[in-house]
Amino acid sequence: MNDSEFHQLADELMLQLEETLDQFEGDADIDSEINGGVMTLSFENGSKIVINRQEPLHQIWLATKTGGYHFTLREERWVCDRSGEDFIALLSSACSAQAGETVHFE
């Protein structure tokens, strides 16, 4: 994957996340902000989740209340380098924990 392809895929991922949050109908108030390729999700309890792209490594990084994760694209999925877990599944789980209700990004 070259840098241009990485940027396109990362942009598509951020757009998908933003659209999902815009359509979220739960009780939790989850605010999202994108600035310089970094997406910050802010929750009512003051906690945050940060998603950013690491261009030199062609990775997506996720920082949650419980830890940091690095994801590489494998077979059209962003997969955690450490656990092999899918980005969307891990993000959904982290958002659900921090929002206090179920949040799905799929």
Curated annotation (Swiss-Prot):
The answer, when asked if Aminoacyl-tRNA synthetase is one of the entry's keywords, is no
One Gene Ontology cellular component = cytosol
Keywords, ordered alphabetically: Iron, Metal-binding
- Molecular function (Gene Ontology), one example: ferrous iron binding
- Which BP terms in the Gene Ontology apply to this protein? iron-sulfur cluster assembly
Under the heading PROSITE patterns, the entry gives: FRATAXIN_1, FRATAXIN_2
The family database entries (Pfam families) matched by this protein are listed as: Frataxin_Cyay
Presence of the UniProt keyword Zinc in the record: no
List the InterPro entries: CyaY (IPR047584), Frataxin/CyaY (IPR002908), Frataxin/CyaY_sf (IPR036524), Frataxin_CS (IPR020895)
Give the protein's biological function: Involved in iron-sulfur (Fe-S) cluster assembly. May act as a regulator of Fe-S biogenesis.
Return the similarity comment: Belongs to the frataxin family.
Quote the protein name from its UniProt record.
Iron-sulfur cluster assembly protein CyaY
Please name the source species. Pectobacterium atrosepticum (strain SCRI 1043 / ATCC BAA-672)
